[in-house]
Amino acid sequence: NAVKYDQQLWPNGEIIYEISPGLRQYEQLILEAMRSYEDTTCIKFRRRFDEDDYVNIHVGDKCYSRVGKSFKGGPQPLSLGNGCTDFGTILHELGHSVGFDHEHSRTDRDEYLIIHERNIKNGSEHNFEKLLESKTRTIGPFDYDSIMLYGSYAFSRDTEAVENHGTRRTRTPYEICHSKRKAELL
């Protein structure tokens, strides 16, 4: 599940970044996550010199990143708030910067997942909206182990939710699970 338009991809697969001083204690972990992409894809990360367009990795109040390169250009935020500085979350947010959207937002997700909407915390429903086919590019089969797939308890109000189907420590969006099983989220 990736950005629809080529203009949202970083030129030559090179993502320019800057890490704010407030994240210095996590810099090695951030760089390790970047290396994970570089080792398994054609994506390269390069520290900002004076470029106008770059990913500004900063301390924020939540975990979020823009999906792909901004049409407008300039700095774009990648926020690592409280609880967002583990390897899997950093890998996930970098995935958004690369151009990947959530696996559970794919247009064909209902063939693979059951979303229990009644278990979604109030105000978090937008995290489970399917993307319109006109706004996304579906890549490969559904990946149950994708770093871009939320765990079964994400935004859940129910502690009895189904277990997560993968380990966020080692998975990348490029590891494809060919399973035909249907998983349940929330």
From Swiss-Prot:
Domain (Peptidase M12A) ranges: 1-186
Cofactor binding, per record: Binds 1 zinc ion per subunit.
Needed cofactors: Zn(2+)
Disulfide bonds: 42-177, 63-84
Record text on activity regulation: Inhibited by 1,10-phenanthroline.
Any one annotated GO CC term: extracellular region
Tissue: Expressed by the venom gland.
Glycosylation sites: 122
SUPFAM superfamilies: Metalloproteases ('zincins'), catalytic domain
Pfam families: Astacin
GO biological process: proteolysis
A single GO molecular function term of this UniProt record: toxin activity
Residues the record lists as binding Zn(2+): 92, 96, 102
Function: Zinc metalloprotease. Provoques deadhesion of endothelial cells from cell cultures, and also degradation of fibronectin, fibrinogen and gelatin in vitro. Its role in the venom is not fully understood but it might act as a spreading factor that facilitates diffusion of other venom toxins. Alternatively, it might be involved in the proteolytic processing of other venom toxins or it might play a role in extra-oral digestion of prey.
Subunit structure: Monomer.
Name under which the protein is recorded: Astacin-like metalloprotease toxin 5
Native source organism of the sequence: Loxosceles gaucho
Lineage: Eukaryota, Metazoa, Ecdysozoa, Arthropoda, Chelicerata
